């Protein structure tokens, strides 16, 4: 099912529908836009018919210089069955040839009061957000000191309970149980909650609680960029866990690699505090302060001095 249709653009940007009402359910599959200037000159070899077409002052001024036959020919070629729509900007008058071609092909012809550049920028941002690659991950997403932390792990390991403790400590819940993730840009993942379970947290033995109702609007967020993954797992005595912090794991979601930290879970460990510190330490590393690396360098210096003596 298409994520975006022409009617969505009409509603989102308050566009005026001139003709082609029967085509407003046409799908839009790309965020790229087209300003068919070279096509106005008659070159349709590489015409991107599947894109939203924008006709600004430049295109329509050139169009006025064409002969009557050329005008009809160019507009018929522009209005194809796969073209989502043509938008005339700046509230300019719609050429009769374009109106006729739109009616014959059933392609939506729209008009906007905005400038071409302004509308193009807004359309691109909207379409990139809607058409971005998406996936869903089982886990909890929390905003901790401005760091979007995705907490993962097997069912029953204590993800929701840890999230509840983090919320009580002043951090903000984004999503529990199912995190919808979309890649809005290269190396940029944004997580949010499905509408059905937004602001809800499930605690075994307690049931479902509404975090916003209990703790206020400051305890929740609608979406957050994900920069750190913390995986909770039951403590395995046979497994060697990182004790210095020099080894950095990675986890790939869609096309983006994120820093991953594995935290072993056992009675007596305050996971909320550990995750808080992990988020703060992650911020420090991004600022160029790496405590583990500094310790390693001091240790190597001490060893070298000891060998010299």
UniProtKB/Swiss-Prot annotation:
Provide the E.C. number(s) assigned to this enzyme. 2.7.11.-, 2.7.4.-
- Sorted alphabetically, which Gene3D superfamilies does this protein's record hold? HprK N-terminal domain-like, P-loop containing nucleotide triphosphate hydrolases
Q: Which reaction does it catalyse?
A: [HPr protein]-L-serine + ATP = [HPr protein]-O-phospho-L-serine + ADP + H(+); [HPr protein]-O-phospho-L-serine + phosphate + H(+) = [HPr protein]-L-serine + diphosphate
Q: Where is the active site?
A: 138, 159, 177, 243
One Pfam annotation reads Hpr_kinase_C
Output one GO MF annotation: ATP binding
Q: Which InterPro entries does this chain map to?
A: HPr(Ser)_kin/Pase (IPR003755), Hpr_kin/Pase_C (IPR011104), Hpr_kin/Pase_Hpr_N (IPR011126), P-loop_NTPase (IPR027417), Ser_kin/Pase_Hpr-like_N_sf (IPR028979)
Sites binding ATP sit at 153-160
Which keywords does UniProt give here?
ATP-binding, Carbohydrate metabolism, Kinase, Magnesium, Metal-binding, Multifunctional enzyme, Nucleotide-binding, Serine/threonine-protein kinase, Transferase
| Tree of life domain | Bacteria
Q: Where does Mg(2+) bind?
A: 160, 202
Instruction: Give GO terms for biological process.
Output: regulation of carbohydrate metabolic process
Q: Other remarks?
A: Both phosphorylation and phosphorolysis are carried out by the same active site and suggest a common mechanism for both reactions.
Annotated function: Catalyzes the ATP- as well as the pyrophosphate-dependent phosphorylation of a specific serine residue in HPr, a phosphocarrier protein of the phosphoenolpyruvate-dependent sugar phosphotransferase system (PTS). HprK/P also catalyzes the pyrophosphate-producing, inorganic phosphate-dependent dephosphorylation (phosphorolysis) of seryl-phosphorylated HPr (P-Ser-HPr).
The entry's free-text remark on domains says:
The Walker A ATP-binding motif also binds Pi and PPi.
User: Member of which family?
Assistant: Belongs to the HPrK/P family.
Q: How does it assemble?
A: Homohexamer.
Q: What is this protein called?
A: HPr kinase/phosphorylase
Tell me which species this is from: Bacillus anthracis
């Amino acid at each position: 099912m298409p994520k975006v249709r022409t009617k969505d653009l009409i509603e989102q940007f308050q566009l005026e529908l001139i003709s082609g009402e029967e085509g407003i359910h046409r799908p839009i599959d790309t965020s790229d836009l087209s300003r068919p200037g070279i096509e106005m000159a008659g070159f349709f070899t590489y015409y991107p018919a599947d894109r939203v077409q924008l006709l600004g002052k430049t295109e329509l001024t050139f169009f006025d210089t064409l002969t009557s036959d050329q005008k009809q020919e160019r507009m018929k070629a522009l209005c194809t069955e796969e073209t989502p729509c043509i938008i005339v900007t700046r509230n300019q008058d719609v050429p009769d040839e374009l109106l006729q071609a739109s009616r014959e092909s059933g392609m939506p012809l729209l008009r906007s009061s905005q400038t071409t550049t302004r509308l193009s920028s807004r359309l691109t941002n909207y379409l990139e957000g809607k058409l971005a690659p998406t996936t869903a991950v089982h886990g909890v997403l929390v905003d901790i000191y401005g760091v979007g932390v995705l907490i993962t792990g097997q069912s029953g390991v204590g993800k929701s309970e840890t999230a509840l403790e983090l919320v009580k400590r002043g951090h903000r819940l984004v999503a529990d149980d199912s995190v919808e993730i979309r890649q809005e840009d290269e190396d940029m993942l944004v997580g949010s909650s499905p509408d059905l379970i937004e602001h809800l947290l499930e605690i075994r033995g307690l049931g479902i609680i509404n975090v916003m109702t209990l703790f206020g609007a400051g305890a929740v967020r609608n979406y957050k960029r994900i920069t750190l993954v913390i995986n909770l797992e039951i403590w395995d005595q046979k497994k060697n866990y990182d004790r210095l912090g020099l080894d950095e794991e990675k986890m790939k979601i869609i096309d983006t690699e994120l820093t991953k930290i594995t935290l072993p879970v056992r009675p007596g460990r305050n996971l909320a505090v550990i995750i808080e510190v992990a988020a703060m330490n992650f911020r420090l590393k991004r600022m160029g302060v790496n405590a583990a690396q500094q310790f390693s360098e001091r240790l190597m210096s001490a060893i070298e001095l000891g060998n010299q003596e």
